[in-house]
A protein has these predicted regions:
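Charge-rich, well-structured scaffold segments of protease-associated domains
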Residues: 1-100, 174-322
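Short, structured coil/loop segments at alpha-helix boundaries
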Residues: 22, 139-140, 146-147, 165-168, ...
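Intrinsically disordered, low-complexity segments enriched in polar/charged residues with Gly/Pro
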Residues: 38, 60, 103-107, 151-152, ...
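A general structural signal for short secondary-structure junctions and capping/turn motifs
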Residues: 64-66, 108, 119-122, 165, ...
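His/Glu-based metal-binding/catalytic segments typifying zinc-dependent metallopeptidases
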Residues: 100-160, 194, 320-322
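A structural supersecondary motif
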Residues: 129-134, 154-196
Length: 322
């Protein structure tokens, strides 16, 4: 139906234009650019002219090709395995020989050198992130220390980052930081820290942020809250219904067969603030970062930002891909 396709294109073009006016959407696009780079955006995003040129014939052909490629069928529901198998045999028609998929997992960009990527957004508040590729592939044995570090340092309103940057120093509207876990066995850990602050507080906020990231404040009271909160959540969390399927696939992607929370729950019981400090020194301290800043560039102190690394300005078209 060409009329429906034309309306779909118009809706998508408008949605894309609206996204460029939204600060959070702009920051999300910048973050993706910082993590994965321009090649990933070009491979996964149609430009507006390419979108406009898309025809019903092309789309239907692409959908038809899917049934000739290797795939899995997930089912959660009341039917028995026999009933589901019979329904698939009747309705799920595939090619006799399925083409294998070229499985290339999305990789974080390296952060061998510090640099600053800036994107323009007209506002009195800026969004700031610093990102590091930690260079290590998944290791399930690291789950307890990483999980407890994230809970203590950057996990929520009681975390060290939030309390220091917003409550104690008044330098950010919000703040968070965490070690990012791989989704596949061959992908690497990353580190991402984020603050939203006023343009005129940028330098003070970044310097304070860097100080607490590299020289983590130690509070037994905050640690107790974090540890108890984590244990309580693990004790009550349940994997139910269709979550069981996604949990199985997530574990399989990491080469695991046993639920990760079991080990975390058992190991965290005996962990101390010293263990969190050791994790911070092992995973976080003195890393090189790529910095991403979304804000009104003419209102920011570029001389200060140059001390973080060479600056490059990226356009909306670059970060969104259209």
């Amino acid at each position: 139906d060409e009329a429906i396709l034309a309306n779909l294109k118009a809706d998508m073009i408008k949605s894309r234009a609206d996204a460029k006016l939204n600060q959070s959407r702009c920051f999300g696009a910048l973050r993706t650019y910082v993590f994965y780079g321009p090649d990933f955006i070009r491979r996964t995003t149609l430009t507006n002219p390419a979108l406009e040129a898309m025809s019903s014939e092309i789309l239907l052909a692409k959908i038809g090709e899917l049934m000739g490629k290797q795939h899995e069928v997930l089912y959660y529901g009341p039917q028995s395995e026999k009933e589901v198998t019979e329904a698939l045999a009747m309705h799920h028609k595939t090619s006799a020989e399925l083409q294998p998929l070229d499985k290339k997992h999305l990789q974080l960009l390296p952060t061998d050198e510090s640099k600053v990527l800036m994107a323009q957004y007209d506002a009195k508040q800026l969004y700031y992130l610093q990102y590091a590729n930690l260079g290590k592939q998944f290791d399930v044995a690291a789950d307890p220390e990483i999980t407890l570090y994230n809970e203590y340092f950057g996990g929520g309103m009681n975390s060290v980052v939030f309390q220091e940057m917003r409550e104690a120093r008044g330098l950010a509207y919000t703040a968070q930081a965490s070690i990012m876990q791989p989704n596949y066995a061959d992908t690497k850990y990353g580190y991402m820290a984020f603050i939203a602050t006023q343009n005129d507080k940028m330098q003070m906020a970044i310097e304070a942020f860097d100080e607490i990231i590299n020289n983590m404040p130690e509070s037994e009271t905050a640690f107790k809250i974090a540890k108890e909160g984590l244990i309580s959540r693990l004790r009550t969390d349940r994997t139910v219904k269709e979550q069981v399927l996604w949990s199985f696939i997530g574990l399989r992607n990491l080469g695991l067969e046993e639920d990760r929370d079991k080990q975390i729950f058992e190991k965290v019981q005996a962990m101390t603030l010293a263990d969190v400090k050791a994790a911070q020194e092992k995973w976080v301290k003195n890393r090189k970062y790529v910095y991403g800043i979304l804000g009104d560039i003419q209102d920011l102190d570029l001389n200060y930002l140059k001390t973080l690394g060479p600056i490059r300005t990226v356009s909306q078209e670059e970060i969104f891909g259209y």
